[in-house]
Amino acid sequence: MPSQSQPRARATAAAALLLSATLAACGGDGDSKDEDLSAQKLNWKDCPAPADSEGGGEAPSPLPGGAEWQCATMKAPLDWTEPKGDTIGIALIKAAASGDKGHRIGSLVFNFGGPGGSGVTTLPAFGSDYAKLRTRYDLVSFDPRGVGRSAGIECEDDEQLDEYFQQDSTPDDDAEKKKLVENVKAFNSACDKNSGKTLPHVRTTDAARDMDLMRQVLGDDKLHYFGISYGTELGGVYAHLFPKKVGRAVFDAVVDPTQSAEEGSLGQAKGFQLALDNFAKDCTSKVEDCPLGDTEKDVKERIATFLDDLDSKPIPGLPPRDLTQTAATNGILQALYSKDFWPYLTQGLEEAYEGDGRILMSLSDSMNGRDEDGEYSNIQAANIAINCADDKARYSTRYIEEKLPAFRKASPLFGDYLAWGMAGCTDWAVEGQADHPDVGAAGAPPIVVIGNTGDPATPYEGARAMARALGKGVGVEVTYKGEGHGAYDSKNACVRDAVDGYLLDGEVPKTGTVCS
């Protein structure tokens, strides 16, 4: 099922489907006591292959020229209110700058979103996209606390997760509602049992403080930063806490920092419905006949009927699992993150209508961090833990039922699914921090804020809200008229020029710039 504020979202979620190369970095716990953590020296080594629990596979391929990706572990306080207490290990990855050392600016730190996404996994998979930026920066990313090898949150085991992600997430009667809440409580109880020591310390404010420690340990006077999706929220919180330490920063696929978890979920309902509308329009406007229907209305009605039928009669998926209504919905949402994956969605739906749910199940597995061997990463456990630690609101069954009409109006297809996702923090062991993050950053330098008009997961309005919330003279708004979650990865020349010009040469784009 979706987690509360489902999911705030993953910038690389859709692309992750066809990526088999992941990696892990060493992490660990320790005892700081009187150690000055800002003076620690990182022990960079060639990155190892990931553990089975992180998806398996091989170590990342060498960089152009033969250099290897380097991994290290940074010690950080477990509890930032007790900086001399116990420590945790924060896993880092780096690609050293490829250009002349005399032109090196420093480190460029990436967060690719989630919350719960592994930067140590994602950066090497997409490193070639940032080759130009690497000419003047060391490219650096990390597993935020609670993610992957950085004291990764552990909840249920793989077998239990198979059941959890197959459950009915859109209950139709009291018995189904009760079962849904019971399953959520059991999952959350397992998180507390297995990771209770860490749960109070995975808030976004904690991760932001880790980034400032990272800045110091990397030897940079300022934090140069590229945040995508949830990474924009993390970057905004950093700018609020450390405005004078912000260097050149870019936010892409921007979370609306003014919204509550409920408002964010409702915004996603509208965003994914828009993406579905655009998908149906794209399919039916092609020269060839759309295999899903003759008109946009036909396409959407057939999908709705298909999902309704799955509620009572699942079809074969990836043996031994069937494709349930929840898995199919999750798979469709996954494919709507990127226009590049619309052909897979078309094929997946076409085959599912004939009784073969394997493609949609694969898409759902990708969203949930499940590999072909049935091993789950901790991306969803971390997503829930971070969201529930951040978001103060807790939503009862009765409250969600009252809000269903608004969600259904926003998205006839996805409204129920996203509304019931708000139950994800029921009986969570840690109190949420706030209704929404503080990102006001008076005194910070310009931050480039890019919004896609067709972004389903972080709707365009979020970029405008972030630019305003950062403060006058800080948020520099750039609009990309296009589909998908994230603008830089679209390879749009206008967007690339705006971002590269700022990060490499300090040229601030004109606020209000529109790229299409």
PLM features per residue range, with description:
Residues 154-168, 239-302, 347-362, 366-371:
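A catalytic-pocket lid/entrance helix-loop region that shapes and gates access to the active site
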Residues 220-230:
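Alpha/beta-hydrolase fold nucleophile elbow
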Residues 456-462:
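Conserved alpha/beta-hydrolase "acid-adjacent" motif
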